């Protein structure tokens, strides 16, 4: 009688397991708090297609660095067509430290997000996570709870210089800040709109998809 639970990226993982055919019968209940259904195509995960650069944090930028691997760009670009065992052996041979360092170096000069969940037709189909959740052939028909927090985005907006001013009344030597909201109405409006948007993409949309797939015990908070 196993219940899986995750928050934020963990909620994303819970939704992924609900869609993954390989996870069938491995758990009996699922809870996702503040999750989301973002998934990336193979090209987006690679970071480049035949026409343009799609994402500086894609695999092509990382694996092309000589500190990570000796693969040529042509080899990396066709990496997804390799046998899965060859892919596994290659990835296992890499240094985790060197991979992370390259990501840290690249992200200083980009606003791109690291591709996380890929529509690779291995776990998540090329249709994407949200459509897979609505697929009755992938339904696990177990009790599912999805939820979000009323002021979800206050965690980020509450420290953003556009909305608040941070004052150190005891000087920075005693780091006890006092936070002053510059425009309370503007701040409240942004928090509500962005938090409602998170609820829509992390609760409402996936629950609608699960209902289409035939789930009978769905709950939201």
Annotated model-derived regions:
Residues 4, 144-146, 220:
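Structural beta-sheet core signal
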Residues 10-14:
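Catalytic nucleophile loop
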Residues 16, 24, 29, 33-166, ...:
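Substrate-access "cap/lid" subdomains that shape
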Residues 22-25, 215:
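Residue-level recognition of short, well-ordered coil/turn positions
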Residues 161-189:
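A solvent-exposed, charged loop/short amphipathic helix patch at secondary-structure junctions
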Residues 213-221:
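Conserved beta-loop-beta element that borders a ligand/cofactor-binding pocket
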